[in-house]
């Protein structure tokens, strides 16, 4: 009977509306609505067709973005525009979600609330390779807990040397400036292959007009000649360095020290009496333990270590579908791919290949519009009541026909 089809269709409509309302606070939930179609019956005795009621052909999923709300939590992630987080369960089944509530398990895997693993690319602290999307795997931070030490291989030093210098002077190390316009000396901390910090002395001594000698010596209390090198510098009348500005520092103990270059690019000779070291740095550092990490918009996980160094320790990759409306909804606010949705396309990084970008410390709330759902509920309820009345009327007509006998 036609009225029964209306009752069934609107009952299903009410269930869809109720489910939307129930999930109005579910993170990453996408609202749904039915697609109604009218049914016809064909007569065998004529070319006419008669209405035969209504049905629901499919349920449409609304993948418009929900609003992002700040949480302040490092592992809360929202997606701006298109894309899904890719998850895998313990049996290897792949799912997709917009729910960005993640946690660290005891093995330091990034998981969702059901314990499924967030997938992407892993990297060690010594090597980063994010160019292979074929090897998506659960993101694990355990191997990134320690950043190995890096021995010093380059010292960068830029000094302004006073061309009026005639004799030695002392150095006030408190402000790194000379007490008198004479010879110059500074201490630089470097790191050996064991990650230990040691000081070396770099001094500049004037030989004659426009010519200087730079001396590099170890301050090792056991052997002050472990590092002991001298290099000649030549300047033109404008104070510009005309000789080599990069030198190789040699050591008596190659097992202890890396090959080190001394880069004096930018060092000049000038007439001013007040001299300072404009640049004074080196590229080594000690071993460090992971303190915090931050997830940036392109999905890179940046670790910060106790030695103040930062390192990319992982990469979250988002997946896209040609037809996301045809994804199969699963319990737990998940979806799985279908033939109609197409295969997932994984971007190299969030924000490229038309992929969405990540928003750290935020969550995407449900895109359910409660006002619309309440209006739809009233409409569905009236439709249901109207079809119920039609059913009663049809029933009376049938009873009347039966009683005519």
Curated annotation (Swiss-Prot):
InterPro entries in the record: Falgellar_hook_FlgE_sf (IPR037058), Flag_bb_rod_N (IPR001444), Flagellar_basal_body_rod_CS (IPR019776), Flagellar_FlgE/F/G (IPR020013), Flg_bb/hook_C_dom (IPR010930), FlgE/F/G-like (IPR037925), FlgE_D2 (IPR011491), LlgE_F_G-like_D1 (IPR053967)
Xref: Pfam families: Flg_bb_rod (PF00460), Flg_bbr_C (PF06429), FlgE_D2 (PF07559), LlgE_F_G_D1 (PF22692)
Domain of life: Bacteria
Main subcellular localisation: other
Keywords: Bacterial flagellum
BP-aspect Gene Ontology terms: bacterial-type flagellum-dependent swarming motility
Subcellular location: Bacterial flagellum basal body
Gene Ontology CC annotations of this record: bacterial-type flagellum basal body; bacterial-type flagellum hook; cytosol
PANTHER family linked to this entry: FLAGELLAR HOOK PROTEIN FLGE (PTHR30435:SF1), FLAGELLAR PROTEIN (PTHR30435)
Family: Belongs to the flagella basal body rod proteins family.
Protein name, as recorded: Flagellar hook protein FlgE
Organism: Buchnera aphidicola subsp. Acyrthosiphon pisum (strain APS)
Biological classification of the source: Bacteria, Pseudomonadati, Pseudomonadota, Gammaproteobacteria, Enterobacterales
Gene symbol of the encoding locus: flgE
